[in-house]
């Protein structure tokens, strides 16, 4: 069986699909069904850890090293993870295209790095590694500001690095442009009246609006969530809006510059039929009244080109459904459709050029991709007759069983638990 695809991103033309599976990046030409780009992260986790500790030990002063009874300096040993230590997975956590689609950015968990690729479709392999920039803490979210890549990490810091610069900077010399006291979950660069801002969301239900690039100046906070924030989405049809979601039963629709909460978009009643026992809290926190928990995995928006109606698409983690809403001119939100699938949806992307929603699935039958067409007359999606099985077969990662899968559902681990 094939390992599922974990992230999917399409270019604006809808011709190229960029996707990840384990530690492999693939670029697929959807018109020909051919693989046109590939990169595999060959980095060995143990080699990376060994290098890090060797650098640390080399800097130790011999005079400060412990002495044994014989008077000889003790040689520091490179530690190895003991029993019960959390595993370090070698996979790609985030994927993003530059605004001009000339670059592809990804994060690697193995060495806490961001990798930058140039995209050249005239070459046999359209991906060329430009730079691999390590960070002190693991990057978890990316945003783009023209010629700079904005990187948020799990420690709560945000960095800005030059896209065009090939030089790799020592991670200890990188200076954060802002910081949270909690783990960051998403980041977005926005503008208002030609002035730029950076929006950051974290595990502690905070959404912060800061000036950019002078991000030490905080404009305001957006208060409306009670659980973690996992998704920040600024729609192209109105960049004065922000749609946020995470561990709550609802999404928040904001006028972010004014700090105004315009609407709450309720999800529980709509997604409840697709919640299973896997959405219950871990056993040690489970009570008789524990609800099944919702975690927002992806938020997309687009505009019906025929009617001008703005559409919102929402994916909740580990569910076999996608929710469709309309947002009218008065910012009222109405549920339009629930798309149900046979298998859990892992990720999705919408291609406006072809009115196509592509979804990646956790499937034992190797039905790893599905696509739906948006009907501009009915404002609904319908399945296409074309299958993507041939495209899914380009997946190079074969596994024996689900036990060989990397963690596919981790967003809900952001949820804070009380021991009392």
Swiss-Prot record:
One of its GO terms (molecular function) is enzyme activator activity. It holds the Pfam family WD40. PROSITE patterns: WD_REPEATS_REGION. The keyword Cytoplasm does not apply. Keywords: Nucleus, Repeat, tRNA processing, WD repeat. It comes from Meyerozyma guilliermondii (strain ATCC 6260 / CBS 566 / DSM 6381 / JCM 1539 / NBRC 10279 / NRRL Y-324). It is found in: Nucleus. Pathway: tRNA modification; N(7)-methylguanine-tRNA biosynthesis. This is tRNA (guanine-N(7)-)-methyltransferase non-catalytic subunit TRM82. Signal peptide: none annotated. Its main location: nucleus. Forms a heterodimer with the catalytic subunit TRM8. It comes from the Eukaryota. Residues 59-68 have a biased composition (Basic and acidic residues). Belongs to the WD repeat TRM82 family. Required for the formation of N(7)-methylguanine at position 46 (m7G46) in tRNA. In the complex, it is required to stabilize and induce conformational changes of the catalytic subunit. The keyword Metal-binding does not apply. GO terms for cellular component: cytosol; nucleus; tRNA (m7G46) methyltransferase complex. Residues 59-82 are annotated as: Disordered. InterPro entries: Trm82, WD40/YVTN_repeat-like_dom_sf, WD40_repeat_dom_sf, WD40_rpt. GO terms for biological process: tRNA (guanine-N7)-methylation. WD repeats lie at residues 87-127, 179-220, 224-266, 340-379.
